[in-house]
Amino acid sequence: VRYSRQVTDGLSADQLFEVMGNMLGELRDGHVNMSSSFDLARNWSWKEDYPTNFSDTLLRRYLSTDYRVSGGLRYRMLDDNIGYIYCPTFESMPGEGNLDEILYYLAPTNGLIIDVRSNSGGLLTAAERLASRFTDSEILVGYMRHKRGPGHNDFSDMQEQRLSPSTHLRWQKRVVVLTNRGVYSAANEFVKYMRECGATIIGDKTGGGAGLPFSSELPNGWSVRFSACPMYDTRQQSTEDGIEPDIAVGITDDDFARGRDTIIERARQLLAGH
């Protein structure tokens, strides 16, 4: 009612867009947005209100310039014989051959770091494909509910989400996943899967975004997107507001000034047995 009172016949397109954008903002959902030819109404508070805990400058110091790239993943062996993979997005699907080559190359290392910091998501199938390399048996990784009617609580019963092991090369050593508040949507799901695969999560709480988005077009041509299918962890707790790390670490000012990524260094210590 509060917003309907603000809509009058004399509103310009910009003014109407602002009113509707503010109304959608009440949901505080990063998957909810509205787009027009001139703007995108969005809620990015899930990452903008928190420390970044990630730096491209620091990342370049670890990857250097001779890192390998395969299937959109950047990887190398660090100088302490720890494998490192940076996964910036799940917008594209890495090929099974790509993942075979990466894991084969990193097989001699003593452990593996998968860095998904600031990965805002993409394809759930891409997240599942990568996670399937880290389990030797089918496991329960969470639950999902589907919208089945117009009512506020018209959702299905909990439906199991299960992860099957890849039929290709699988990792058998320790693995750490690095997170920050920029981890969202499919990347948030990846962290949920990897926790059930036995990985240690290090960094900051993820941004969340545990709802499959649905898009539609408004009569005036603007498009609107909203969450339709809520998702939960194995304890049937919503991960919409993020997943807490096993070891909470942030990049310190001192380390940043020295060119050190505090979160990567903590993962290296763990994998080295310290």
Segments predicted by a language model, with ranges:
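Conserved acidic, small-residue-rich alpha-beta core segments centered on
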Residues: 125-260, 265
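A recurrent domain-boundary module in secreted/ectodomain proteins
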Residues: 262-274
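Flexible, low-complexity junctional segments that flank or bridge functional domains
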Residues: 1-146, 153-160, 174, 201, ...
